[in-house]
Structures are given as C-alpha cells and as structure tokens.
C-alpha cells in the first residue's frame, strides 16, 4: 500500500464496510425460504478483502509509527492523521462487523 494511495485505499475500505453491512442486512431480511447463498458468497468475499485491508493498514501503521523516515514526503501531522484514520476504520471493521 503506497502512501500516495492512502486516501483511495481508505475510501475503498469504507465502501467495503458499507457493502458488507448491506449484504448482512439483505441476509437478515430475507424472507423465509428465500435463498441467500449468493449474498453469503458475496459477503465472504467482501469480508476476505476487508481482512486484507486490515493487514495492509496494520503494516502501514507500523511503518508510520516505527519508521516514519521511509515517508519523507508525508508530514508528521499527516502521519498522525493517517494513524488515527487507520484506528477508526479498524474500529469499524472489528467492532461493528465481528
């Protein structure tokens, strides 16, 4: 995950969280007897992608915290903002969806 793509990657992760919530709602609101196999398949794929996002954000968080010199074009203030955004998205993913 490149720092140049941080905002896009963060937005993509937010979109996946919303997509997963929608998929969960569709499964929960299905009529009795209605097949939800396709929604479950999509939900599992979205969840797997979010797990990858978490892993990538964890790695980036490590670099921002322990090796900020690898990102000379990113200010300390911006690094802290990104660390906070990473914690926020992880909280959404791990807290509300697990």
Predicted regions and their residues:
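Structured binding elements
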Residues: 1-98
